[in-house]
Amino acid sequence: MTNIRKSHPLLKIINHSFIDLPTPSNISSWWNFGSLLGICLILQIATGLFLAMHYTSDTTTAFSSVTHICRDVNYGWLIRYLHANGASMFFICLFIHVGRGMYYGSYMSIETWNMGIILLFAVMATAFMGYVLPWGQMSFWGATVITNLLSAIPYIGTTLVEWIWGGFSVDKATLTRFFAFHFILPFIIVALVMVHLLFLHETGSNNPSGLNSDADKIPFHPYYTIKDILGVLLLFLFLISLVLFAPDLLGDPDNYTPANPLNTPPHIKPEWYFLFAYAILRSIPNKLGGVLALILSILVLALIPHLHTSKLQSLMFRPLTQALYWILVADLLILTWIGGQPVEYPFIIIGQLASVLYFAIILIFMPMAGMIEDSILKMD
């Protein structure tokens, strides 16, 4: 008799995706973050659903409803902080996942890579809208500043901004629609994740060496299910520690002040995971130029497969590009720090230099390093 998991139409799909999936035998712990992202997404949808049961998307009651969740709902504080810090975990895993793809040349599976970039944009949009919902000072002013950037679009900009706002300023209509979008987007993300996995399983996973591993594959279960469970346990340990010991560590104190359109906070800044892009936006004195740089800071990832000049896929055997890669990581950390600093000397010039370096490494230095390494190895 055939095993039911191999014959049942639905179980067959799950079997081919998570059980009998042929997987390279040498993938390292850097490959754990895909499954961790899946866990983060499930956690965010689950906690978000319970928060939505108690939240009200009205400007007069939104702030109070979040306070009510924390004070009066059973374990409401736990659900709220799991959701808020879960978003930070989500982005930590996302950045490592993208960084792994860049380091080991996984971007050569172009469909999977492009789907991942679309997912990154979708998650960033969801997180931005979620940050507006508690209706604190930073929620309100963050929404005002970021949506206002669209007014830089020639001719239709102002009309577009007012259309998104649902009026002449960020108000009740804006909050209601942001709540609606924040609720629906994670389910769209789930669908996109399925497409992402569909493309991935067409080609199979890459591995640290960047070489074809068809000759040496092992089943995903039990080897990598066990390995993923260890990753999940470590993720939960980190998340629970953050939630129970320092729940507001990554938040902004300004968001504990109810939104006030008449009082601007001294430093408007987004959550930590957007600071690198915010620093790039601020480093350009022109509004439209800044908006384009902001979008390109993520969209530039789509160019990476087309700028791959080396005959070796992974950076494992390419020390020159490896050095550039780690300079890029350091540069992103500098941009993150600059994004949280006030707009004054010396932070302005540091931000501008770091922004130029970010684009230069990806667009110029890495492709050049690939060609230099090929010529050193006499592979051209």
Curated annotation (Swiss-Prot):
Cofactor binding note from Swiss-Prot or TrEMBL: Binds 2 heme b groups non-covalently.
Needed co-factor(s): heme b
Chief location category: mitochondrion
PANTHER family: CYTOCHROME B (PTHR19271:SF16)
CDD domains per the UniProt record, alphabetical: cytochrome_b_C, Cytochrome_b_N
Cellular compartments annotated: Mitochondrion inner membrane
Residues noted as binding a ubiquinone in the record, renumbered to the chain: 201
Entry annotated with the keyword Iron: yes
Species, as recorded: Eliurus majori
InterPro entries, sorted: Cyt_b/b6_C (IPR005798), Cyt_b/b6_C_sf (IPR036150), Cyt_b/b6_N (IPR005797), Cytb/b6-like_sf (IPR027387), Cytochrome_b (IPR030689), Cytochrome_b_C_euk/bac (IPR048260), Cytochrome_b_N_euk/bac (IPR048259), Di-haem_cyt_TM (IPR016174)
Subunit structure: The cytochrome bc1 complex contains 11 subunits: 3 respiratory subunits (MT-CYB, CYC1 and UQCRFS1), 2 core proteins (UQCRC1 and UQCRC2) and 6 low-molecular weight proteins (UQCRH/QCR6, UQCRB/QCR7, UQCRQ/QCR8, UQCR10/QCR9, UQCR11/QCR10 and a cleavage product of UQCRFS1). This cytochrome bc1 complex then forms a dimer.
Binding site for heme b b562: 83, 182
Coiled-coil regions listed: none
Outcome recorded upon mutating residue 356 to I: In strain: Isolate Emaj614
Effect of residue 327 to V: In strain: Isolate Emaj614
Membrane topology: Multi-pass membrane protein
Task of the protein: Component of the ubiquinol-cytochrome c reductase complex (complex III or cytochrome b-c1 complex) that is part of the mitochondrial respiratory chain. The b-c1 complex mediates electron transfer from ubiquinol to cytochrome c. Contributes to the generation of a proton gradient across the mitochondrial membrane that is then used for ATP synthesis.
UniProtKB keywords: Electron transport, Heme, Iron, Membrane, Metal-binding, Mitochondrion, Mitochondrion inner membrane, Respiratory chain, Transmembrane, Transmembrane helix, Transport, Ubiquinone
Protein name in the entry: Cytochrome b
Other remarks on this protein: Heme 1 (or BL or b562) is low-potential and absorbs at about 562 nm, and heme 2 (or BH or b566) is high-potential and absorbs at about 566 nm.
